[in-house]
Amino acid sequence: MEKSNLIWLNGEFVNWEDANISVMSHTLHYGTGVFEGIRARDSKIGTTIFRLPDHVDRLFDSAEAYNLKIPFDKEVITNAIKDSVHLNNLSSAYIRPLVFFGEGEMGLLPKSVPVYVSVAAWNWGAYLGDDAGNQGVRVCISKWKRISPQSFKPTAKGVGGYMNSTLAKVDAVAVSYTHLRAHETLDNLV
């Protein structure tokens, strides 16, 4: 990962190296966080952030599904995203807003655990590699089944929901594939 200089954390910009959280963070133990993955691209009119209002809306919707009360409004988060790109002098970037529970009570009910928000932006080329567009990619069907949409809100981008995809990706790469397609369970099919 190509680190940038600054990360927005709980309302202020801090040096990348200083953007740390406790190993006792509820999210680290239980996967109770949400995020977005947003792209900024250099264009004829300058840097543009793809569908920023839609991404911010989904971040807030995902947070609501996980009972994370974001301590900032949408305008503050939108500006933090824009400023993260600008202050890091990025014309093209990957932007990762993350909402997560900090340190506090353990257990499945984080009722008095503080909610933190971070926004990181960095230079990240093509997701499947710079040659993928020209050379194509090798894709396999994973032995891991996609998590049922009845298990959690399928439109929420929850950090815990990506463990399934991580297992499948590790397996795919281990046998020389570039990417994967998870099996659909019967209840995922229309």
State the predicted function of each range:
Residues 1-72, 79-83, 106-184:
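Helix-start/capping segments and mature chain N-termini
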Residues 100-105:
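Short, internal active-site loops enriched in acidic
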Residues 69-74, 86-98, 128-129:
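Short secondary-structure capping/junction motifs at helix and strand boundaries
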